[in-house]
Structures are given as C-alpha cells and as structure tokens.
Amino acid sequence: MINKNEKKILDLFGQEMRRCFGDRLKRIVLFGSRARGDNTPDSDYDCLVILGEVSPSVKAIIDEIAGDFLFRYNVVLSILPKMEEEIHDQPYNPFLKNAFQEGIVL
C-alpha cells in the first residue's frame, strides 16, 4: 500500500526513533490514510509510537524528530506516543483497535 518514497521516509523515521529510544521503543504503527492507501499527496503520516514510557522529555524528543522531518523532507509526521501498558489496558478502545486493524507495523 505504501510506495517506495513513503517507505524510504518511514524507514528513516524508524531508524531515528530506534536511535533515540533504543529498547524503550516497542513498536511503530502507520495508520490512517497512508496505511489505507487513500491518501493525497499532502496527507500527513499518522504514526502510533508505542514506548515503555512516555514522559515530557520523550514527547519533546518526538516533537523534535517531527520538526526535523518537516524541515528535511517536507513531510508532516503526526506522532501519537502511547505507553505499552496503555495499549494493553485498553483492548476495546475504538481508536486503538482501528489503528491496529488498518495499520502497518513498521
């Protein structure tokens, strides 16, 4: 569903997240229009980022990465950080359920 250029951007994003968070990064899931394949050229990249912990400093790093990608590659990353524990505690959350059903694990 994702094209070669989108894959390159997402691979770079995954590498940067792994570099910054190491083992604390559990999973990245692309969801929304780019995962479904009904995006427009201006669509953002909706990414659910699952981490061992989410603190203000973690959110600041994620915001910095998103800003860097906007500057370097002219793409908008809409990053939603969630703790792994939150995901397990909310198995019936409609938003999370939909993100996992339509999503692509990176």
What are these regions (language model features)?
Residues 33:
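Conserved H-loop
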Residues 46-49:
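Short beta-strand->loop micro-motif that forms the acidic, two-metal-ion catalytic signature
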